[in-house]
Amino acid sequence: MRKFFTLLWLLCPVAAVYYHFNEGKNEVARIQARKHVEQIRGMERAKEPDWAAIIEEYDKLSAELPKTEAPLVRHQIRLAKSKAQLELLDVAGSIEELTSLLRECAQTHGEDAKITRATREMLGKAHYYATYLLKTNGAAEEEWRPFAERTRQIFRFLAEHQEPGALEKYEDRVAAEFNKTINK
């Protein structure tokens, strides 16, 4: 029994070195990326966020992730970056990025995945912003009408393909908030 524990004690450094040179680097990169995400979220919560700096930080975050990182994480970062682009009113760039991201998400995760749905919602918002900006700047109807139609199609698709109990959950939340407000 004594030999077994001695052998086990001598093999511990081998296991630690193996982990350090294989999965350890990726884990350290993930921890740094997590801290970077917290920093970016703090920048987003600022009273007047600098969206250009936030977009740059998302680019840096994408670069510092390990190559073997799950596609879901990369898609979430791209979605957050597209949201920042929309806040900066780079509507055309955001629509282009969201369209390619939607294709990738649908192929990788499926049409009903949360990330695919979130991307589709953000794409609908981007088309709505494009419609609004074109209309308020006096563009002809032929220019803004395709964006309005695409917005309608996206949100109709989302409404038709929602979870079966989503509407009831939403109504329950609204009723609970309403009751809380009345009881105060």
Annotate each language-model stretch with its function.
Residues 96-99, 117-121:
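Carboxylate-rich helix-loop segments that flank metal/cofactor sites and access channels
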